[in-house]
Amino acid sequence: MILTLTLNPSVDISYPLDQFNLDTVNRVSQTSKTAGGKGLNVTRVLSEFGEDVIASGFLGGALGQYIEEQIETTRIKQAFFKIKGETRNCIAILHEGQQTEILEKGPTIELKESEEFKSHLLKLFKETDVAVMSGSLPKGLNTDYYADIVRLAKEQGILTILDSSGQSLEEVLISNVKPTVIKPNIDELSQLLNYKVTNDIKELKAAVSQPIFNDIEWIIVSLGSEGAFAKHNQKFYKVNIPNIKVVNPVGSGDSTVAGIASGLIHQQTDEELLKKANAFGMLNAMEQQTGHINTDKFDEIFKQIEVIEV
């Protein structure tokens, strides 16, 4: 089973406007509300592809209940941990071809809740083969909280995928127990190394071979429209992708993570895993809805992706 963790989920609200006027009333004719968070995008895509997946994380208050109810309608398994705080809203105002976002920080997790959640995870780990950790940490959690989860998972023989950035990712990289997979984009890779990394293959090889990445089995670097670059143990790969009509790229990284998780749990070859991961990301970008793929188009896209050992 694949376990997805969304520790700072949200109710994502979208307000489309022809024009956004400051300091006055803006009336919205259509509103969309969805259960949001990077891990939930991963969950939905895995479920659409038919994988055995369960979603967990922190939920609280009326908004947390709304997320639970939304997930129930999709029949996706869930095992969220209830907290005293209120789950957050994230608002996107879509106007004149632009997107203005208002993101709440979310609840503060109490120390007791953070410790009890680890016990909650240990129960879920009994049936877990792959654990996916996505997104930011809520307030109240130590920056090394993901590192703690990776350690607990590894003790149970579980493969782990971490899709995070900033200090929470850095804490994992300096810990003595490493995740199976990390998936930085080129900007996040540059931030970790404190120098600008380009798409040049030699530069990418040197970058992912830095000591900070020692003992991480898979490093998969998204290169946007240029595909991806990957290191698996001592092998390096360049992934070339076909041109597609991009409808909505939001959530494509999360969909790529879903493909990685699917590849891991089925013990697929390096080429198959990388092609599946990139196909999932592209299929998401071809759809209007975030965290959604048209599985009928999977084979067509999969066949067009090229993986070259470099």
Curated annotation (Swiss-Prot):
Belongs to the carbohydrate kinase PfkB family. LacC subfamily. It is an enzyme of class 2 (transferase). InterPro entries: Carboh/pur_kinase_PfkB_CS, LacC, PfkB_dom, Ribokinase-like, Tagatose/fructose_Pkinase. Signal peptide: none annotated. Its EC number is 2.7.1.144. Keywords: ATP-binding, Kinase, Lactose metabolism, Nucleotide-binding, Transferase. This is Tagatose-6-phosphate kinase. GO terms for cellular component: cytosol. One of its GO terms (biological process) is lactose catabolic process via tagatose-6-phosphate. Pathway: Carbohydrate metabolism; D-tagatose 6-phosphate degradation; D-glyceraldehyde 3-phosphate and glycerone phosphate from D-tagatose 6-phosphate: step 1/2. It catalyses: D-tagatofuranose 6-phosphate + ATP = D-tagatofuranose 1,6-bisphosphate + ADP + H(+). One of its GO terms (molecular function) is ATP binding. PROSITE patterns: PFKB_KINASES_1, PFKB_KINASES_2.
